Curated annotation (Swiss-Prot):
Known cofactor(s): Mn(2+)
Subunit composition and interactions: Homotetramer.
Principal location class: mitochondrion
Gene Ontology CC terms, in alphabetical order: mitochondrial matrix
Organism phylogeny: Eukaryota, Metazoa, Ecdysozoa, Arthropoda, Crustacea
Keywords, ordered alphabetically: Manganese, Metal-binding, Mitochondrion, Oxidoreductase, Transit peptide
Designated name of the protein: Superoxide dismutase [Mn], mitochondrial
Subcellular location: Mitochondrion matrix
Positions of Mn(2+) binding: H46, H94, D177, H181
Entry function: Destroys superoxide anion radicals which are normally produced within the cells and which are toxic to biological systems.
Transit peptide: 1-20
Length: 224
């Protein structure tokens, strides 16, 4: 219940419960652009089916929330918290995820590279730690590279679709989806193959400032 209330407060501040409907964001690349690491079939299903379902269900939950608030129906407001957390988190997480991926791959540079070297010793160390912790997620969830307000980078995992910032306070920089729909058609049950450090090189050249703005966009109606 405390987590649900915390999520509700953060989501409200972020503009997640706004009146216009959330929409599925366009991808900045074709479905086949990430092959062979991620197949076109997985990308098409993941984006147009799974993410779209989170968007649809989030809109339904927000409509029910608005009705309950107008009626002063506190019981219904409370009962909607899990749906808002799950579908709102799914929408936020995937909106960040698509922007993290790059057809050309690439390595961190500039401000982000300096922060990674400071906090992990090297990019390779960061990738290895991120891969190991993400592979170890039990069931469905996400692995994240994020940072705290002071700027220190941390690796964290979240179960299901729990959004990183609302759950841990970390601002998300780079996320890895380890729900089976993200890899099973291609990698079957061998999750670790997808998460070997060479696969994580799909990470683009992102900056701390750019990623902060990306996270803010992912929680707004206009950016969704």
């Amino acid at each position: 219940m405390l987590l649900a209330r915390a999520f509700a407060r953060r989501s409200l501040r972020a503009g997640l419960w706004c009146r216009q409907k959330h929409t599925l964001p366009d991808l900045p690349y074709d479905y086949g652009a990430l092959e062979p690491t991620i197949s076109a079939e997985i990308m098409q299903l993941h984006h147009s089916k799974h993410h779209q379902t989170y968007v649809n269900n989030l809109n339904v939950a927000e409509e029910k929330l608005a009705e309950a608030k107008e009626k002063g129906d506190v019981s219904t407001i409370i009962s909607l918290a899990p749906a808002l957390r799950f579908n709102g988190g799914g929408h936020i997480n995937h909106s960040i995820f698509w922007q993290n991926l790059s057809a050309d791959g690439g390595e961190p540079e500039g401000e982000l590279l300096a922060a990674i070297n400071r906090d992990f010793g090297s990019v390779e160390n960061m990738k290895n730690q991120l891969s190991a912790q993400t592979v170890a997620v039990q069931g469905s969830g996400w692995g994240w590279l994020g940072y705290i307000a002071e700027g220190a980078l941390q690796i964290a995992t979240c179960p299901n679709q729990d959004p990183l910032e609302a759950t841990t306070g970390l601002v998300p920089l780079f996320g890895i989806d380890v729900w089976e729909h993200a890899y099973y058609l291609q990698y079957k049950n061998v999750r670790r193959i997808m998460l070997k450090p060479s696969g994580i090189s799909l990470i683009g050249r992102i900056s701390l400032q750019g990623s902060m703005q990306q996270s803010k966009n992912a929680t707004s109606c206009s950016g969704a």
